[in-house]
C-alpha cells in the first residue's frame, strides 16, 4: 500500500539546499506572513555555538534562538533521544496514559522542588496557564468573587503575542490595534517595590507575574533584593508570586533559574525554550498542590502537552545542563564576555549589562543598532537588536573561553569600526 501511495505523491519543489540566500528570502516574502524582520541570513546547519548559511559561511550564534538552544545546536544526546523515542511512540494525547509522562513529571518536580508540573508546549501557553491557575486559586482559596480576579504584571514584560499576552503588554508594537483586551490585568513599573505593594493591596489581586531578568526589554536586571522584596510582599498580601523563567531560566543567567540569584521560591514558575534544547516545543508550569489541584479534569489541557517525545527530550535537555555543567559555564563565560564588552568606548556604548551569558549593550542613539547587527553578520557573528538601540548577546551555554574571546574581538572591532565610519 505504501508503494502505491508513493507513486501518487507529487514531486516536491526544488529543495532549499539548492537555493541561494536571496532566493530563500524572496520565497518567504512571497508565501509567508510578514510578522518578522529577520537579519538577511539563511541558515542551513548548526552545531554547538555555531551556525552556517546556505552558502557555507560560518557564524557565531549569539542569539541561541532567544535562549532555546542553551545546550548548543543539534546536541548529540538530544538527537539520539529524539530518534529513539520518535521510532517508538510520539503522541497519545492525554486521553490515555503513556509510559513516559510520569517519568518526566517525577524528574522535573524533584529537580525544581515543587509538588506538581503542568506540561504544555510553548512559553506563551505556559504563562497563560499560570494566569489561569492563579485566577482559579483566587476564587477557590483566597475567596475572590467570580470574575473579579486581578493579575498584576511588570511593565515592559514580554511573554508572547496571544490575546492574553498582549493584554498584559505595555509595548504598542505588540498590542496596538488588536483590542479589545482581556480584563483583569494591571501593570506596574519594573523594579519598583512600592508600585508592587500599592497594586497588590487590592483584595482581588490573585498574582504578580514578573521576569527575573527582562529579556525582550533588553536584558534589564532589577536591583539586588527586588525579587526577595516581591516575594515578601506577595506573602504579606496573600498574592501568588509567579516568575516567568521562559527566557531567563535553565542556566542562561549563570544559575539554573534566574530567581535563584535572590534566593526566593515563587509560588509558580514557568519554563520553556531551553526545556527542549531547541528540538521540540516544550514548556511547563511548576507549583505546589495548593495551587495546582484547584484545576479539575476538563478545565485545562493540551493535545500535545506531555507527549512522550516532548517528555523524553525535556529530561535529556535538563540532564545535559547538569552533566556538562553548563550553568556553571554560563556564569564563568558570562563574566569573561562582560569584561570584554566593558572595554567598548563609552561614547559608542553607553551601557553594558547582564548576568551569566544573558548580556546586552546599549548603543548611542546616533548609531543604528540594526545596522550594527548587519555589520556583525558580515564579520561572522549573529545577534539581534531590540528596541532600536539595544543588542542582546546570548550564545549557547556550551561556548568555551577561546570562542568567547574570538566572538568578543568580533564585537569590539565591529562596533568601533562602525562608529568611525558613521
Curated annotation (Swiss-Prot):
Q: What is its EC number?
A: 2.6.1.13
One of its Pfam families is Aminotran_3
Q: Cofactor(s) for this protein?
A: pyridoxal 5'-phosphate
The alphabetical list of record keywords is: Aminotransferase, Mitochondrion, Pyridoxal phosphate, Transferase, Transit peptide
Q: Which molecular-function annotations from GO does this UniProt entry contain? A: identical protein binding; ornithine aminotransferase activity; pyridoxal phosphate binding
Question: InterPro entries annotated for this entry?
Answer: Aminotrans_3, Aminotrans_3_PPA_site, Class-III_PLP-dep_AT, Orn_aminotrans, PyrdxlP-dep_Trfase, PyrdxlP-dep_Trfase_major, PyrdxlP-dep_Trfase_small
Which PROSITE patterns does the entry mention? AA_TRANSFER_CLASS_3
Q: Which NCBIfam families match?
A: Orn_aminotrans
Identify this protein by name. Probable ornithine aminotransferase, mitochondrial
Q: Which gene is this protein's source?
A: oatr-1
Amino acid at each position: 500500500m505504501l508503494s502505491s501511495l508513493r507513486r501518487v505523491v507529487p514531486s516536491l519543489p526544488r529543495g532549499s539546499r539548492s537555493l541561494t540566500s536571496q532566493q530563500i528570502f524572496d520565497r518567504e516574502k512571497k508565501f509567508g506572513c510578514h510578522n518578522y524582520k529577520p537579519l538577511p541570513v539563511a541558515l542551513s546547519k548548526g552545531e554547538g555555538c555555531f551556525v552556517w548559511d546556505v552558502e557555507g559561511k560560518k557564524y557565531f550564534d549569539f542569539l541561541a534562538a532567544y535562549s532555546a538552544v542553551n545546550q548548543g545546536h543539534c546536541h548529540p544526546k538530544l538527537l539520539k533521544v529524539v530518534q529513539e523515542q520518535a521510532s517508538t511512540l510520539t503522541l497519545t494525547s492525554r486521553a490515555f496514559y503513556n509510559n513516559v509522562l510520569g517519568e518526566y513529571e517525577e524528574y522535573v518536580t524533584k529537580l525544581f522542588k515543587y509538588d506538581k508540573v503542568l506540561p504544555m508546549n510553548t512559553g506563551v501557553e505556559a504563562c497563560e496557564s499560570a494566569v489561569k491557575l492563579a485566577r482559579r486559586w483566587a476564587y477557590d482559596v483566597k475567596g475572590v468573587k467570580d470574575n473579579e480576579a486581578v493579575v498584576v504584571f511588570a511593565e515592559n514584560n514580554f511573554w508572547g503575542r496571544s490575546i492574553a499576552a498582549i493584554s498584559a503588554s505595555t509595548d504598542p508594537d505588540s498590542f496596538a490595534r488588536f483590542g479589545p483586551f482581556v480584563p483583569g490585568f494591571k501593570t506596574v513599573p519594573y523594579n519598583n517595590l512600592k508600585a508592587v505593594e500599592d497594586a497588590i493591596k487590592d483584595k482581588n489581586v490573585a498574582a504578580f507575574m514578573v521576569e527575573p531578568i527582562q529579556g525582550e526589554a533588553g536584558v534589564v536586571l532589577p536591583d539586588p533584593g527586588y525579587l526577595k522584596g516581591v516575594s515578601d510582599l506577595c506573602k504579606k498580601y496573600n498574592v501568588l508570586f509567579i516568575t516567568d523563567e521562559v527566557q531567563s531560566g535553565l542556566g542562561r543567567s549563570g544559575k539554573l533559574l534566574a530567581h535563584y540569584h535572590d534566593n526566593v521560591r515563587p509560588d509558580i514558575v514557568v519554563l520553556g525554550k531551553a526545556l527542549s534544547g531547541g528540538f521540540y516545543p516544550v514548556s511547563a508550569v511548576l507549583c505546589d498542590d495548593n495551587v495546582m489541584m484547584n484545576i479539575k479534569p476538563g478545565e485545562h489541557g493540551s493535545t500535545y502537552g506531555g507527549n512522550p517525545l516532548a517528555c523524553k527530550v525535556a529530561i535529556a535537555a535538563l540532564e545535559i545542563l547538569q552533566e556538562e555543567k553548563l550553568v556553571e559555564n554560563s556564569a564563568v563565560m558570562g563574566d569573561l564576555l562582560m569584561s570584554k564588552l566593558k572595554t567598548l568606548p563609552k561614547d559608542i556604548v553607553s551601557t553594558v549589562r547582564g548576568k551569566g551569558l544573558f548580556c546586552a549593550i546599549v548603543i548611542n542613539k546616533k548609531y543604528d543598532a540594526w545596522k550594527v547587527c548587519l555589520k556583525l553578520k558580515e564579520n561572522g557573528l549573529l545577534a539581534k537588536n531590540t528596541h532600536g538601540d539595544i543588542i542582546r548577546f546570548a550564545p549557547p551555554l556550551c561556548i568555551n573561553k577561546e570562542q568567547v574571546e574570538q566572538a568578543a574581538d568580533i564585537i569590539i572591532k565591529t562596533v568601533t569600526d562602525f562608529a568611525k565610519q558613521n
